[in-house]
């Protein structure tokens, strides 16, 4: 099934201009996180335009949305979860002690007595929700100071969450949710139904423990969001969770006997909260071909080392005038959210088959006999390489001699910028990363 896209209507007007500005700002922010080579001082992104040539879309399949699209953000639902737990605790208290819910008793209790604890003394609590003992090293839960966030951000929720996290554009962080008692990721196993409400309320009322300030900004280059954001698991990134847990290299973690016992005896982290599947949820797989005139304007400042290192910087203007793209897009509609991403070559071959198989199926619709190719030809028809097959670019700096730039590093700058554009696209828009639009 092929569909026509009103490209001009979708990319023009106030909404189209706002979307183009958001894309420009996003690419610009990503370039600020890239470790630049010695001969480039900075890269600025000035403009983005969708162009006038629309892509070619061919619908391949309607199916159920990927499970990753149903994951909820812990920071968005922390307040809801706490309210639900509070209501559950209140209803349990009222059901077990109905005589204490009378108005006369409540007034007498409020005036003359303190509120009794519904659980007997000595009731065992979960060791994981109790205050940290002296046997745990305080460096086990570091809290690095972060500008703009009082007290810093705790990395506990980030390292203890499941392998499925947030991607690229999800661009919102869920790691900061680890600072509250309900998003710590500890399991409630071993706790009774009554003790769960008590321990959570007790943990929420505790005063924060003093923790040492550890400076983690000792990296020589700015990390990209691929190294700071947890990614969704897929067939090609099953080890992403292991890599994430090893990114916080603090030398203060001691492998003592008490620490090992605490880790080994603790339960595994809870799985991510999942939204409920509904019959109206659907997902579309589309084969996208694009050879258009999308434009991206950048400026890279080149450093000149003569007569001394980093003597002066010259701006090099780079204009991306078009790209050639061939890949499989995924569009999922879940409630009032639209999730969008592309599939890698391996995932696309696994879901909809290699390109040669698609060509045979499309040719078979004409009821013409097709010759069966050999296995070597079939292997050569598999998708390979990146999704961006070609990026056309024009550079402007100073004068030219015989159609060539005078400066020697212009070619290096062009290759570096184009490689970063390709990397940003593949890291932020290729599954398991995806973008979410609220409609």
UniProtKB/Swiss-Prot annotation:
InterPro entries, A to Z: Mdm12, MMM1_dom, SMP_LBD
Chief localization: mitochondrion
Any Gene Ontology CC annotation: ERMES complex
Pfam families in alphabetical order: MMM1 (PF10296)
Domain SMP-LTD: from-to ranges: 1-439
Ranges of Basic and acidic residues composition bias in the record: 78-91, 247-261, 362-371
Location in the cell: Mitochondrion outer membrane; Endoplasmic reticulum membrane
Keywords (A to Z) from UniProt: Endoplasmic reticulum, Lipid transport, Lipid-binding, Membrane, Mitochondrion, Mitochondrion outer membrane, Transport
Membrane topology classification: Peripheral membrane protein
GO molecular function, one term: lipid binding
Extent of Polar residues compositional bias: 215-245
Single Gene Ontology BP annotation: mitochondrial genome maintenance
Annotated region (Disordered), positions in chain: 70-103, 185-274, 354-386
UniProt remark on domains: The SMP-LTD domain is a barrel-like domain that can bind various types of glycerophospholipids in its interior and mediate their transfer between two adjacent bilayers.
Its job: Component of the ERMES/MDM complex, which serves as a molecular tether to connect the endoplasmic reticulum (ER) and mitochondria. Components of this complex are involved in the control of mitochondrial shape and protein biogenesis, and function in nonvesicular lipid trafficking between the ER and mitochondria. Mdm12 is required for the interaction of the ER-resident membrane protein mmm1 and the outer mitochondrial membrane-resident beta-barrel protein mdm10.
Self-association state and partner proteins as the record states: Component of the ER-mitochondria encounter structure (ERMES) or MDM complex, composed of mmm1, mdm10, mdm12 and mdm34. A mmm1 homodimer associates with one molecule of mdm12 on each side in a pairwise head-to-tail manner, and the SMP-LTD domains of mmm1 and mdm12 generate a continuous hydrophobic tunnel for phospholipid trafficking.
Family: Belongs to the MDM12 family.
Name of protein: Mitochondrial distribution and morphology protein 12
Organism of this sequence: Aspergillus fumigatus (strain ATCC MYA-4609 / CBS 101355 / FGSC A1100 / Af293) (Neosartorya fumigata)
């Amino acid at each position: 099934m092929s569909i026509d896209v009103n490209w001009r209507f979708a990319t023009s007007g106030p909404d189209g201009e706002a979307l183009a500005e958001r894309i420009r700002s996003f690419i610009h922010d990503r370039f600020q996180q890239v470790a630049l080579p010695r001969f480039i001082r900075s890269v600025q992104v000035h403009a983005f335009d969708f162009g006038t040539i629309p892509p070619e879309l061919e619908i391949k399949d309607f199916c159920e949305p990927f499970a990753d699209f149903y994951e909820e953000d812990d920071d968005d639902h922390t307040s809801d979860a706490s309210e639900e737990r509070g209501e559950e605790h209140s209803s349990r208290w009222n059901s077990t002690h109905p005589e204490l819910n009378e108005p006369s008793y409540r007034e007498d209790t409020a005036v003359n007595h303190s509120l009794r604890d519904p659980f007997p003394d000595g009731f065992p609590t979960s060791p994981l929700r109790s205050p940290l003992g002296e046997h745990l090293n305080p460096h086990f839960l570091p809290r690095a100071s972060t500008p703009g966030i009082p007290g810093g951000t705790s990395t506990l929720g980030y390292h203890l969450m499941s392998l499925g996290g947030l991607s690229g554009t999800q661009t919102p962080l869920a790691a900061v949710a680890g600072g509250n008692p309900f998003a710590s990721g500890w399991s409630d196993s071993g706790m009774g139904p009554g003790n769960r409400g008590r321990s959570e309320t007790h943990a929420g009322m505790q005063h924060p423990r003093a923790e040492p300030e550890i400076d983690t900004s000792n990296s020589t280059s700015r990390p990209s969001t691929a190294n700071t954001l947890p990614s969704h698991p897929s067939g090609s990134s099953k080890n992403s969770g292991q890599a994430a847990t090893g990114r916080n290299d603090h030398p203060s973690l001691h492998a003592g006997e008490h620490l090992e016992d605490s880790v080994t005896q603790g339960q595994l982290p809870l799985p991510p909260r999942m939204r409920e599947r509904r019959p109206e949820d659907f997902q579309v797989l589309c084969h996208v071909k694009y050879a258009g005139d999308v434009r991206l304007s950048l400026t890279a400042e080149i450093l000149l080392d003569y007569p001394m290192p980093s003597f002066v910087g010259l701006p090099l203007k780079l204009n991306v005038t078009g790209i050639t793209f061939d890949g499989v897009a995924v569009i999922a509609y879940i409630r009032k959210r639209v999730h969008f991403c592309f599939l890698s070559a391996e995932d696309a071959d696994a879901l909809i088959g290699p390109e040669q198989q698609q060509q045979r199926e499309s040719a078979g619709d004409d009821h013409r006999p097709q010759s069966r190719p050999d296995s070597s030809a079939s292997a050569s028809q598999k998708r390979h390489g990146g999704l961006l097959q070609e990026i056309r670019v024009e550079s402007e700096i100073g004068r030219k001699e015989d159609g060539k730039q005078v400066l020697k590093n212009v070619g290096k700058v062009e290759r570096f910028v184009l490689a970063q554009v390709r990397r940003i696209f593949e890291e932020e828009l290729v599954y398991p990363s995806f973008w979410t639009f609220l409609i």
